[in-house]
UniProtKB/Swiss-Prot annotation:
This is Cyclin-dependent kinase 17. Belongs to the protein kinase superfamily. CMGC Ser/Thr protein kinase family. CDC2/CDKX subfamily. Residues 30-55, 103-123, 501-523 are annotated as: Disordered. The gene is CDK17. Coiled coil: none annotated. It comes from Homo sapiens (Human). Found in a complex containing CABLES1, CDK16 and TDRD7. Interacts with TDRD7. Residues 192-473 form the Protein kinase domain. Gene3D superfamilies: Phosphorylase Kinase, domain 1, Transferase(Phosphotransferase) domain 1. May play a role in terminally differentiated neurons. Has a Ser/Thr-phosphorylating activity for histone H1.
Amino acid sequence: MKKFKRRLSLTLRGSQTIDESLSELAEQMTIEENSSKDNEPIVKNGRPPTSHSMHSFLHQYTGSFKKPPLRRPHSVIGGSLGSFMAMPRNGSRLDIVHENLKMGSDGESDQASGTSSDEVQSPTGVCLRNRIHRRISMEDLNKRLSLPADIRIPDGYLEKLQINSPPFDQPMSRRSRRASLSEIGFGKMETYIKLEKLGEGTYATVYKGRSKLTENLVALKEIRLEHEEGAPCTAIREVSLLKDLKHANIVTLHDIVHTDKSLTLVFEYLDKDLKQYMDDCGNIMSMHNVKLFLYQILRGLAYCHRRKVLHRDLKPQNLLINEKGELKLADFGLARAKSVPTKTYSNEVVTLWYRPPDVLLGSSEYSTQIDMWGVGCIFFEMASGRPLFPGSTVEDELHLIFRLLGTPSQETWPGISSNEEFKNYNFPKYKPQPLINHAPRLDSEGIELITKFLQYESKKRVSAEEAMKHVYFRSLGPRIHALPESVSIFSLKEIQLQKDPGFRNSSYPETGHGKNRRQSMLF
């Protein structure tokens, strides 16, 4: 009977039906691109592919832990109930491990979970590790499922699922991984609780929410779907870009929930945006904090630009900040990947105050430098406490720009004299004014850097990568430049926020501020 149970425990259970109703859009978010080659699991020792049930998912995700998996000799596969030889580690001796024969008819042990330090009594009196009862940590599960770095499955959830399975080292198929994520709770609206409305726009409503799975706060961007038109192109664009952008200074897209009536994007929750932060400071920020925020903006942008992704809608409302001071780029609804340099894009893309003059004058051929003008405007706003060019119309915006930086000429902006829109406006001939007169809190290095951002010719604007190396950031130390992309700058002990001079310890009331909050998340 024991031999029969032993044989039965080595067989694999049949596959369960998988719900294939999730859209390809949700699949692309939850499945990493580099796993697309793994259409089916690797067959080991002549076994068929594993099933797609939750139990087999757990089996497949217990292979890469701190200790190497134990390999089963072919004689055991054939039915022998002898001892197993563990693989050696670091040249140490082989440990003898006996199979735990107390198995249920479904091949699962009916004993409680054990850890790698648990011991069982061998018939020969040797103390042995029980290889079946290995405790899987949250880190193990997150790594194997490629979950976002700040998602943590609670310990209680691991215990509830009884994740204690023999180690398997074969990779998981896309199909099986998708089913596993769904069984955990991803892609389901019931996994999230709506707490309060943060804002509402033409196409989307944003809620503050909580994940039942992790107890973490989330931002739920609920996009209404019209049956005639389907998902707005901005939503599709945002999802397609964010699923590939994994960086400490870019907002994390945790999940996608697709129903017949809506598409809900589940983002990490950050308490406020840069506009709210400046309001809380009475628009008088610490210049040290200005430097930290500017560096993080550049760091996130440099990552995007290396991947030929343009944000195209930079503004304080699209820069989210948490309590630590970590700043993250958000709202990629107008962003797009730049694959062909000469490709013509729509020129209706950027909020007016942060729109560069070449776009204001009708240029639709641009590159990553389109974002750098907006960085300069935001830099000035943080340092001075007021918007740099708060124009109400395109003409008014250009008027404010030319009055400060000087009306461009053929010498200062080659080709401008032949621009029809520029000629039609017939602007007065303004002379440039010293920027230090308008931002007296900036030092000479800061003035030099902001000047590099505010160049009429887009190709002359400093890149995000180059700006990070500017002498203005020298006081932050050298280690900040060597951080991995996924690591926050606040992981360095020398990087800390300072108290802002104008900070007032006040917050928005519980109600009445929804329309002013998180406008960055709306279409």
